[in-house]
């Protein structure tokens, strides 16, 4: 399906491992526009007499579009670099990830409200046996 492929291109360009605020904002706009286009143009063939794989695929793409938006919002909200989330604005002078454990040592969950808006909820993590430390891969 074209929408699925286009969504992958948007995410690869704007929300890959190396991310910037400008790229994330552009990706968010593109995903929202793609979702509007999807719902305006989606056509599902088949009937209800048996399993409709076209409907299943369309619903899966709809889920991917929503997940992509939340993933981008989360990356925008997270003002640090850590692991597979590298924000170009949050790097050391040597190009290494600049973590912010005080603010981001947590588990986040996003909730979609009745108006379609998204809210992040977070729960702090605690490490009692192993101290947190920055890993050096050099």
Tell me what each language-model feature is.
Residues 1-138:
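Glycine- and aromatic-enriched mobile tails/lids
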């Amino acid at each position: 399906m074209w929408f699925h492929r286009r969504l992958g291109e948007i995410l690869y360009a704007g929300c890959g491992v190396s991310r910037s605020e400008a790229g994330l904002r552009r990706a968010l706009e593109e995903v929202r526009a793609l979702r509007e286009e999807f719902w305006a143009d989606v056509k599902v063939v088949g009937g209800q007499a048996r399993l409709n794989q076209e409907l299943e695929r369309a619903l899966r793409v709809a889920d991917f579009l929503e997940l992509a938006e939340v993933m981008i919002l989360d990356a925008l909200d997270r003002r640090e670099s850590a692991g597979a989330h590298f924000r170009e604005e949050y790097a050391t002078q040597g190009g290494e990830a600049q973590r912010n454990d005080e603010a981001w040592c947590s588990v986040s969950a996003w909730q979609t409200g009745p108006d379609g808006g998204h809210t992040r909820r977070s729960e702090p993590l605690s490490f009692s046996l192993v101290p947190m430390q920055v890993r050096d891969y050099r």
